[in-house]
């Protein structure tokens, strides 16, 4: 009985410490830009030069096929729109984050995420975005948007996210 009481006290204590302020929304998926997305103002969303506008109106994520890093037609359409916005807003440095689903080894998925980010980088450069503004990074399977064992989840995690890291102006 004493053990059950201690377990109940520990559970209540942990529940009281829970943070309900918005939490982490993985960068770049469904408008996510990181911590506390609820702090985006309507003014930022309506400013066509803002990071919030880019994420929510232009879109900052492209998805990939299983075990692939080749851009499909919908990814190219999304990147054409991104390139147009990036050319109109030259003051930003861009970080391209490559991701993979949970299948495969850590090392394999880091390499795959890097190849996905490179594919996006090459496409944006071909559309006129300066390569000096673009940096690539891979998280492999380390930062999933969703964790589950279905193709629907895996599909969301096979992505490259375009992050506007800073304004140069």
Locations of regions flagged by a protein language model:
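A generic structural micro-feature
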Residues: 152-156
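Short beta-alpha junctions and helix-cap segments that line functional grooves
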Residues: 146-150
């Amino acid at each position: 009985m004493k053990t059950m009481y201690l377990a109940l006290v520990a559970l209540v204590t942990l529940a009281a410490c829970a943070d309900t302020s918005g939490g982490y929304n993985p960068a770049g998926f469904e408008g996510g830009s990181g911590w506390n997305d609820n702090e985006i103002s309507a003014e930022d969303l309506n400013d066509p030069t803002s990071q919030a506008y880019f994420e929510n109106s232009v879109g900052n994520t492209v998805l990939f096929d299983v075990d692939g890093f080749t851009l499909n037609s919908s990814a190219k359409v999304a990147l054409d729109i991104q390139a147009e916005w990036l050319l109109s807003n030259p003051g930003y440095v861009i970080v391209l984050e490559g991701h993979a689903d949970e299948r495969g080894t850590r090392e394999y998925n880091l390499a795959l995420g890097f190849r996905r980010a490179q594919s996006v980088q090459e496409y944006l450069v071909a559309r006129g975005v300066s390569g000096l503004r673009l940096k690539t990074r891979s998280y492999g399977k380390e930062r999933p948007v969703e964790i589950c064992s279905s193709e629907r989840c895996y599909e969301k995690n096979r992505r490259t996210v375009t992050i506007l890291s800073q304004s140069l102006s």
